[in-house]
């Protein structure tokens, strides 16, 4: 994948072609030429390009979030290193288990949740996790955004995770 630099992205103008000139001394922001072309075509709908320091701060914050999730989720294996995708899978399963437990306590005498789909155990998803991790690595212009919904509901509902894929 060819990578475009910040000044090449800004100087490319209104054309939507994927070709952008670069010099050897320009700073690389990690954006593919395709995503730069998409942002030129999209106009002002997309946010301005971040400088290198802002990108580093965002990456540091995300790594801190993953570390915190590793501490909070008791189902993560402690004897080996786990990928970010596997951390997210364990978080989803753990939140779902908590929701099922809350629902079963509120519905005295019944078990299960309100029609929540049955999820396969993690051991059967290892192949899918590996494939997804390869896909995420190959699509560097996409991010997964985690959003906690407790504030929107006034804290009355357990938190859940929403996943959105956005192009930068």
Swiss-Prot record:
Main localization (coarse): cytoplasm
Renumbered ranges of motif Nuclear export signal: 91-104
UniProt xrefs under CDD domains: bHLH_dnHLH_ID1 (cd19691)
GO CC term, one of those recorded: nucleus
Region of interest called Interaction with IFI204, as start-end residue ranges on this chain: 53-106
Transcription regulation listed as a keyword: yes
Modifications the protein undergoes after translation, according to the UniProt entry: Polyubiquitinated; which is favored by Ifi204 and leads to proteasomal degradation.
SMART domains per record: HLH (SM00353)
InterPro entries reported in the protein's UniProt record: bHLH_dom (IPR011598), DNA-bd_prot-inh (IPR026052), HLH_DNA-bd_sf (IPR036638)
GO molecular function, one term: protein dimerization activity
Pfam families: HLH
GO BP of this protein: apoptotic process; BMP signaling pathway; circadian rhythm; collagen metabolic process; endothelial cell apoptotic process; endothelial cell morphogenesis; heart development; lung morphogenesis
bHLH domain location: 46-98
Keywords: Biological rhythms, Cytoplasm, Developmental protein, Nucleus, Repressor, Transcription, Transcription regulation, Ubl conjugation
PROSITE patterns membership: BHLH
Gene induction: Expressed in a circadian manner in the suprachiasmatic nucleus (SCN) of the brain and heart with peak levels seen between CT16 and CT20 in the SCN and between CT8 and CT12 in the heart.
Subunit structure and binding partners: Heterodimer with other HLH proteins. Interacts with CLOCK and BMAL1. Interacts with COPS5, IFI204, GATA4 and NKX2-5.
Chain's role: Transcriptional regulator (lacking a basic DNA binding domain) which negatively regulates the basic helix-loop-helix (bHLH) transcription factors by forming heterodimers and inhibiting their DNA binding and transcriptional activity. Implicated in regulating a variety of cellular processes, including cellular growth, senescence, differentiation, apoptosis, angiogenesis, and neoplastic transformation. Inhibits skeletal muscle and cardiac myocyte differentiation. Regulates the circadian clock by repressing the transcriptional activator activity of the CLOCK-BMAL1 heterodimer.
Protein name: DNA-binding protein inhibitor ID-1
């Amino acid at each position: 994948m060819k990578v475009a630099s910040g000044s090449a992205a800004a100087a490319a103008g209104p054309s939507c072609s994927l070709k952008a000139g670069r010099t050897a001394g320009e700073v690389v922001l990690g954006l593919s030429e395709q995503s730069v072309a998409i942002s030129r075509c999209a106009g002002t709908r997309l946010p301005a390009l971040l400088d290198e320091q802002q990108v580093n701060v965002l990456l540091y914050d995300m790594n801190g979030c993953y570390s915190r999730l590793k501490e909070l989720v008791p189902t993560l294996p402690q004897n080996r290193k786990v990928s970010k995708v596997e951390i997210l899978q364990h978080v989803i399963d753990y939140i779902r288990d908590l929701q099922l437990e809350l629902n079963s306590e509120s519905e005295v005498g019944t078990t299960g949740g309100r029609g929540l789909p049955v999820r396969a155990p993690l051991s059967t998803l290892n192949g899918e996790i590996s494939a997804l991790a390869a896909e995420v690595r190959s699509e560097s212009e996409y991010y997964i955004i985690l959003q906690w919904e407790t504030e929107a509901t006034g804290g009355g509902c357990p938190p859940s995770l929403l996943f959105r894929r956005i192009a930068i």
